[in-house]
Regions:
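Pre-Walker A (Motif I) flank of P-loop NTPase domains
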Residues: 1-5, 30, 148-151
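Conserved P-loop NTPase motor "coupling/switch" region that bridges the ATPase
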Residues: 109, 129-220
Length: 221
C-alpha cells in the first residue's frame, strides 16, 4: 500500500516526509529513497531531516556516483531527482542503479515529493492530439513495481488536475483486484465520465480508508 499526502503549500510536507523516513529508520530500515523535483532541494531535505535529529550526511544525492558505478552507501537516504530517475547512458540507467542498491527485499520508504511530476505517465489526449506517457512518470512507476515491499509515500499539493494524472499512484489500490475497476484504463474512463463529482468520491473514499490526507493552512489571523 501507499499513502498520499496532499497537504497544501506551506503545510510542511517536506518535514512530514523526513518524519516518515525517520520512523522507518528507527525501526531498522536504514535505506530509503527520496525523489524530489530538482537538485537544489537537497538542502531543503537536509534541513528537514536534521531538524528531526538526523545527520546532514545521512542524505546523499545520487549525483555523487557515476551512472555506471555501484552506489557505495551502506545506510542512508538516497536523494534522486525526477530528471535523474529517467536518465540513461548506453546500457546503464539510473533506475537500475537505484534498484541494485536497494536490493530486491527493500522495505524502506520511497517518498515521491512533488509527485505530480510523474503525472503524464499514462499519456492520453493532449491539446495537439494523443501523446505518449512521460519517461519520468514511467520510471517512477517502474521503481514502485521493482521494489514491491517498499513503503510508498506520495506528496503533492496538486495531486491530480486531471484523473489521468493519478495513473502513477499504483499503490493506492484505486484499480485492480478487490476494486470496482479491472484496470487503470477502466478507472480513468469511468471517473472521467463522472466529472468533478466522481473525483470528489475518489478523494472521499481514499480519506475514509486512511490513504489520503489534505490539510491547508488557516487564513485566520
Amino acid at each position: 500500500k501507499g499513502f498520499f499526502l496532499g497537504d497544501g503549500t506551506g503545510a510542511g510536507k517536506g518535514r512530514q516526509i523526513a518524519a516518515c523516513i525517520l520512523d522507518n529508520w528507527l525501526r531498522g530500515r536504514r535505506r530509503n529513497i527520496w525523489v524530489t523535483k530538482n537538485a537544489p532541494l537537497l538542502e531543503d531535505a537536509r534541513r528537514d531531516w536534521t531538524a528531526l535529529g538526523g545527520l546532514n550526511g545521512d542524505i546523499q544525492p545520487i549525483s555523487n556516483w557515476k551512472i555506471d558505478e555501484p552506489i557505495k552507501l551502506d545506510q542512508g537516504v538516497l536523494l534522486v531527482t525526477y530528471p535523474t530517475l529517467r536518465s540513461l547512458r548506453g546500457d546503464h540507467s539510473r533506475l537500475k542503479q537505484i534498484t541494485d542498491w536497494a536490493g530486491a527485499d527493500f522495505d524502506g520508504v520511497i517518498a515521491f515529493d512533488e509527485a505530480h511530476e510523474m503525472g503524464g505517465v499514462a499519456g492520453g489526449e493532449g491539446p495537439l492530439g494523443a501523446k505518449e506517457g512521460s519517461q519520468q512518470g514511467i520510471c517512477g512507476v517502474l521503481l514502485q513495481n521493482y521494489l514491491p515491499d517498499a513503503r510508498v509515500l506520495y506528496a503533492s499539493a496538486t495531486g491530480a488536475s486531471d484523473i489521468n494524472n493519478l495513473a502513477y499512484a499504483v499503490r493506492l489500490g484505486l484499480w485492480g483486484p478487490e476494486t470496482a475497476f479491472a484496470d487503470r484504463e477502466q478507472f480513468i474512463s469511468s471517473i472521467r465520465k463522472g466529472g468533478i463529482a466522481a473525483m470528489e468520491l475518489v478523494a472521499r473514499d481514499l480519506k475514509a480508508t486512511g490513504l489520503y490526507m489534505a490539510r491547508a493552512l488557516s487564513f485566520a489571523g
